[in-house]
Amino acid sequence: MAKLSPRDIKRKINGIKNTQRITKAMKAVSAAKLRKAQALLYATRPYSNKLYELIEDLAVYIDRESHPLLEKREEKSVDLVIITADRGLAGAFNSNVIKTAWREIQRLKSEGKEVSLLLIGRKGVNFYKNKGFNIIEAYEDIYRDQVNLTYTAKVGGILASRFIDKKSDAVYLINNELITSSTYETKIRKLLPLESTASSKKLEEVSVYNIEPSKEEVLSSLLQRYINYQLFRALVESSTAEHSARMLAMDNATKNAGEAIRKWTIIFNKARQEAITTELIDIINAAEAIK
């Protein structure tokens, strides 16, 4: 490697400083977006959990076979909803989902099951679209505007129709979920069919309620809402975790840039000192020659 002049080193330091300013600004933007996303997420979770509890309790009282969205059957065909981000610069955020989904696909295929994918997020779409899988739908740019229930109702309708028509025997969500402001985990959750874990105590508690017009009709109306809202929650979880991951990635990049600036500043000072020393020696030698 050719030795750099002090001017070249100074130019490199200035370039790193420009990059550092960009990563610092991106960190600030991600932090602001994270706070906004967390407010939505913390409002979403209680409703989602309560809706699940309500459906779980109602499902105890009816024959599962009487409602197509509750029917449990052998999983010969599985739909996977893979949720990634549209953008990068978020550390291992997207690769974690892609790798987890890939392992799950290979596991299911090794068991002789058919796998179909519904992809949400450009990173996942770009990775899986040319891998030879059956792609149900592929969505990009969904995070440009705030995720809404109109969008998730469309996706939920597609998944419910496939399950009812027996094109799939189970539906799973694969996405990142926020654990703390600085940590997230990649989760695989079953969306369909709904699995009830209600206890006998719950059975006694719910049996005292009078439900109009009937448990079956109320449950039927809630099930599609449950599917739509679970998708909504998964997207909000993913979006919030993305902002957290990007904020941390940009924070690390800013710190690394600072370390690089310090390193190159030392090199610059040494190079400048050497240049000054060389110039002084040349001046002394020239003066000696004149004598």
UniProtKB/Swiss-Prot annotation:
Topology class, membrane: Peripheral membrane protein
Main location: membrane
Keywords assigned: ATP synthesis, Cell inner membrane, Cell membrane, CF(1), Hydrogen ion transport, Ion transport, Membrane, Transport
GO molecular function, a single term: ATP binding
Cellular-component GO terms for this entry: plasma membrane; proton-transporting ATP synthase complex
GO BP of this protein: proton motive force-driven plasma membrane ATP synthesis
Entry keyword annotation includes Transmembrane helix: no
Keyword DNA-binding annotated: no
Subcellular location: Cell inner membrane
InterPro entries linked to this entry: ATP_synth_F1_ATPase_gsu (IPR035968), ATP_synth_F1_gsu (IPR000131)
Gene3D superfamilies hit by this protein: 3.40.1380.10, ATP synthase, gamma subunit, helix hairpin domain
Family under the similarity heading: Belongs to the ATPase gamma chain family.
Function: Produces ATP from ADP in the presence of a proton gradient across the membrane. The gamma chain is believed to be important in regulating ATPase activity and the flow of protons through the CF(0) complex.
Complex and partners: F-type ATPases have 2 components, CF(1) - the catalytic core - and CF(0) - the membrane proton channel. CF(1) has five subunits: alpha(3), beta(3), gamma(1), delta(1), epsilon(1). CF(0) has three main subunits: a, b and c.
The protein's name in its UniProt record: ATP synthase gamma chain
Gene responsible for this protein: atpG
